[in-house]
Structures are given as structure tokens and as C-alpha cells.
């Protein structure tokens, strides 16, 4: 008997403790966590710096709403924007909220409504974000979606050129479609998007909810492409396990959201900001990012060496890796769990690997050994 809704296919594992990449269940069994709470636990479980930040802030101030000035929000906003061409941040609580804000900002700023998204994308489960998501299974059963969203084939330059015109407010995409199968934007497609934006005055919204904050080895995944965003949405890894989202946007948007035009009660509360600042200070350190890049390259190399290429394809970037299988991967994930490795799917045929950014080579070796045993 349960008092919870049945909207999650929960696994029969009760996790009670975590430290770094290791989590422990109520029976004392340890697992390598290569889910990171779905790309959330950037610095691993119970990172000392995050624990300290949360403890110290919890003894000062928990919540005041956004009716009052916040130097802490100002500092975090500067940390997130200073390495970009963007100027301002707005804080919320989740990726879906950040994407809702991005949609509202683009429509209000341009006075246009049409937003082009892509098939197999995932932008959230609130109604605007769900309408932007290019997956029928996410939208099924909820009636008509919001108007003025069109999902195009991903990486299809011809389809993009046919769809763009002066009525388009924005193009919205993920650099890597994580939920949709770990599909990366191709260089030619990125160039075509930028050309379309320049030619038609279209805004570019990049959803970095899963790829941002060091997940791909750079601060933001778009940095490794030709894409130049006008708007970025963030969440997941930004809080290292504490709920926080953010919208970043350029100088020209400052007056678009005037007082009362958009808001959130909890967004940017002192607890969330203190944790996020700690995460950003760690992850945006060049030495930390270099370490992520090195460990990501090692993980990919080991997977390609140990898994038969005819049966599996390894794709993705940084520590967001997908293993594509010709067979459905549900049984593989279940068997890996039995052997002490937690994984998450990306659709029915892709295993997604999302270890903490602090994962060690020894932990990578252990995970690859389990995967080899399960998949071969």
C-alpha cells in the first residue's frame, strides 16, 4: 500500500547514504552511482564543501522571497555569466521552470510566438516545456499542446531551412539530447542554426539543464560548438543535489522582464544560492574542468576498448555518455544494478552514464568491468 502517485517506475532499492560516487542501501549494499540523480550530484554525494555551505547558511537565513535585494544572488549571477556573452540571470527551482521563463522571455521580447524545437528533445513536464518537447510519449493524454511550437527533425539542415522565416521567435535546442538518446548536435547543423538566426533575427535558446555546469568538460556544452545563445536555461548540476534553476540572457533582455512580469517565490533562496555558489566555484576552476575532460576521455576509451563495436555504439561528450544497443536495455540496467552499478536509460535502446564529475579512474574501471560483464 502506498500514499504516493504511480508516476515513477521506482526500483526496489532504498538508498540511505552516499559519499562521493558510492551510495549505500538499507541492507548495507554499496553501489557505484553512475546516475548522479540524473546529472544532478555534480560533486558527488555529501561533498564536504557543499555540506559546510548548507550548514553555515542554514544557521543564518533560509528564505526571504525576492521582495528584498540579494548580494548572494548577484554574486552567483556574475559567476554564471562572466565567461559568456550573456549579462543577466534569473533564479528559479528547476529546469522546467527555467525553460518556461526562456519561452516567456523570447515571446515577450520579440512579440512573436513560433518557437522551433526538435524531435526527441526534452525540456520539462510543465505545460509550456512539455509543448516544446519533441516526444509524443511525454505529451500523451494531456490534450492539445500549447500553440506555436514546431518540432523539427534533429540535425536536419534541409528541414530547418524550410521551417525558418520572419515569424519565428526562437529556436530552442539541447546541445546533446540527453533524455532523447544522447544525440549530439552536428557541426554543420550548428552552423545552419546560427545562419538562420542571423538571417531572420531569430533568438537562440540553449537548454543546458543536463549538459551545463561542467558535465561535458566545459562550463557549458555550447562552448564546444559554433552555437552562440541569446538565452540559456540551467538546473540539475547547478545545485549539486539542492533544487535550483537559472535563466541566463543577454544585455538586450534587461527591460523585457519588468517588475511583475515574471517571478517565483522560492527561486534563488539563500540555501539554494549558497550551495550553487559552492558548486560553481569548484566546477568552473580550469583545473577541475581539465580533470573532467581527462576522466571523460578515459571512460570513453575504456568503453570502446571493452565493448564489441558491432553490438554497441558509444556516443556523447564529457561525462554524459550513451551506449546504444540494438536490443532493449532494460534488462541490462537491472543486471548492472544487481552487480553494484546504477545506470539510467535514455529511451529504450541507450544506456546513459552520468557519474559525478569527481569520479575517479578506479571507479571508472570498476564500472566498465561491470558493463563488460553485463553486455558481453
Where are these regions (language model features)?
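Conserved N-terminal phosphate-binding loop of PLP-dependent enzymes in the Aspartate aminotransferase
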Residues: 1-376
